[in-house]
Swiss-Prot record:
Function: Involved in the biosynthesis of isoprenoids. Catalyzes the 1,3-allylic rearrangement of the homoallylic substrate isopentenyl (IPP) to its allylic isomer, dimethylallyl diphosphate (DMAPP).
Keywords for the protein's UniProt record, in alphabetical order: Cytoplasm, Flavoprotein, FMN, Isomerase, Isoprene biosynthesis, Magnesium, Metal-binding, NADP
A GO BP annotation: isoprenoid biosynthetic process
HAMAP family the UniProt entry points to: Idi_2
First-tier enzyme category under EC: isomerase
This protein's name: Isopentenyl-diphosphate delta-isomerase
Catalysis performed (reactions): isopentenyl diphosphate = dimethylallyl diphosphate
Subcellular location: Cytoplasm
Amino-acid positions noted as binding FMN in the UniProt annotation, renumbered to this chain: G71, M72, T73, S104, N132, K203, T233, G282, I283, R284, A303, L304
InterPro entries attached to this UniProt entry: Aldolase_TIM (IPR013785), FMN-dep_DH (IPR000262), IPdP_isomerase (IPR011179)
MF annotations from Gene Ontology: FMN binding; isopentenyl-diphosphate delta-isomerase activity; magnesium ion binding; NADPH binding; oxidoreductase activity
EC number: 5.3.3.2
C-alpha cells in the first residue's frame, strides 16, 4: 500500500471537494431562514430606480456592489483546475469591482509549488483579494503550528489585501483525517493580529457564528466576520461523500444540517458587535442579499452558484449570475424606497416563524428592530 503524506493528502482532498460540489447534492436540507425575514413594501418609493447607489465601503476599500466572491479552492492536484477556477472568478471580480477570496492555502504553505493556483493578480490587478488559512493550524497542540510567518506567506505570495482565518470545527470533526485541535486558537489569533499589518477576517464555513464567538473575536481585534451560516453548502455533506467506511458516513450524515442559519447568524453578530459582516451560506439571489444587508451585513458572499461556470472558464457566465443578483437587489431597494445600502439598513423588516422564535430567545429582538425607518 502506497503511503501518502499529509500534505499530498491535503492537495488530493481539495480536488475531491470540488468534484463533490459539482456532481453531488451538497447543500443543507434546512434553510438559511431568510424566508422568515420580510420587507415592508412601499407604494411611494420617492426614488428613481436607476439612481440607486449600490456601492459600499468595507475595510477601507470602496466596491461597486455589496457582493463578494467567496473563497472556494486552490492547491488542487495538478493545480490547473483550481487555477482556472480562481482566475475565472478573479476576472469577474475585476470587471464588477467586487472583492474575492481564495480557498484554503494550507496546500500552498506545505507545497509551495501550488502557489500559482491561488495567484490571480495577472488577470485582476485591482481587486480586493483575501487569502485563507485554517484556524486549527494555529492551535497550541498542532504539530508545526502556524504563526505570523505562514500568515505573511499566505498574503504576500498571492499579493492579497487581507487574510481570512477559516473556522471549520464541524467539517474537521466529521473528516477522518480532520484536525480537531482548537485549544489556544483565540490566543494565537490575538497574537497574530498584534503582528500582522493586514486585516484579518474570521470566517466560518457553513455552521454560522454565534454572538458569543463574535464578541470574543471583536475583543481580540479581528477586523471582520464572515458568518458562513447554515443553509448553503454543507461541508459535512461533502465529507459524507468522501467517507470510505460506514462509521464515517453515519457521523457526517448526522451532522449534515448542523449549525446556525445564515440570517440568524448575521442578526446575532450585528446585535452583539460593530464589526463589518460578510454574509455567506446559501446566498442564492439578490433578495437574500438585500435581506442580509438589512439585517446588518456589509457584504454578501456567493460561492457554489459560481462554481460551475468557473470550472468551465466562463467569465461571462459568472458575471451573468452576479448581474442577476445585482438587478434583483436594486429592485428590492426600489420597492422599499432605499436609495443606498446605508438606507437599506434602516428600512422596516418583519421577522416571523422559526427566525422569530430563535431571535427572541437569543437577542432583544424588539431593540434590534425598533427605530427602523427612512
Amino acid at each position: 500500500m502506497v503511503k501518502v503524506d499529509k500534505e499530498e493528502l491535503t492537495v488530493i482532498r481539495k480536488f475531491e471537494h470540488i468534484e463533490h460540489c459539482l456532481k453531488k447534492q451538497v447543500e443543507a436540507h434546512v434553510s438559511t431562514q431568510f424566508e422568515n425575514i420580510h420587507f415592508v413594501h412601499t407604494s411611494l418609493p420617492e426614488i428613481d430606480k436607476d439612481e440607486i447607489d449600490l456601492s459600499v465601503e468595507v475595510l477601507g476599500r470602496k466596491f461597486d456592489y455589496p457582493i463578494m466572491i467567496a473563497g472556494m479552492t486552490g492547491g488542487t492536484k495538478g493545480s490547473q483546475l483550481a487555477g482556472k477556477i480562481n482566475k475565472t472568478l478573479a476576472k469577474a471580480a475585476q470587471e464588477l469591482n467586487i472583492p474575492m477570496g481564495v480557498g484554503s492555502q494550507r496546500a500552498m504553505i506545505r507545497k509551495p509549488e501550488t502557489w500559482e493556483s491561488y495567484y490571480v493578480r495577472d488577470v485582476a490587478p485591482d481587486i480586493f483579494l483575501v487569502g485563507n488559512l485554517g484556524a486549527p493550524q494555529f492551535a497550541e497542540n498542532m504539530p508545526n503550528r502556524y504563526g505570523v510567518e505562514e500568515a505573511l506567506k499566505a498574503v504576500e505570495t498571492i499579493q492579497a489585501d487581507a487574510l481570512a482565518i477559516h473556522m471549520n470545527p464541524l467539517q474537521e470533526s466529521v473528516q477522518p483525517e480532520g484536525d480537531t485541535q482548537y485549544k489556544g486558537v483565540i490566543t494565537a489569533l490575538a497574537e497574530l493580529k498584534g503582528e500582522l499589518s493586514y486585516p484579518i477576517i474570521a470566517k466560518e464555513t457553513g455552521a454560522g457564528v454565534s454572538m458569543e464567538v463574535a464578541i470574543k473575536l471583536e475583543s481580540i481585534g479581528i477586523d471582520a466576520i464572515d458568518v458562513g451560516g447554515l443553509g448553503g453548502t454543507s461541508w459535512s455533506s461533502v465529507e459524507y461523500y468522501r467517507a470510505k467506511d460506514e462509521k464515517s458516513k453515519n457521523l457526517a450524515l448526522k451532522f449534515w444540517d448542523w449549525g446556525i442559519p445564515t440570517a440568524l447568524s448575521v442578526a446575532e453578530v450585528r446585535y452583539a458587535t460593530g464589526l463589518p459582516i460578510i454574509a455567506t451560506g446559501g446566498i442564492r439571489d439578490g433578495i437574500m442579499i438585500a435581506k442580509a444587508l438589512a439585517l446588518g451585513a456589509n457584504l454578501a458572499g456567493v460561492a457554489l452558484p459560481l462554481l460551475k461556470p468557473a470550472v468551465n472558464g466562463d467569465v461571462e457566465g459568472v458575471i451573468k449570475i452576479l448581474q442577476q443578483y445585482i438587478d434583483e437587489l436594486r429592485n428590492v431597494m426600489f420597492l422599499v424606497g432605499a436609495g443606498s445600502v446605508k438606507e437599506l439598513k434602516k428600512v422596516p423588516i418583519v421577522v416571523t416563524g422559526f427566525a422569530r422564535e430563535w431571535l427572541e430567545q437569543r437577542i432583544d429582538l424588539w431593540e434590534f428592530l425598533r427605530d427602523r425607518r427612512l
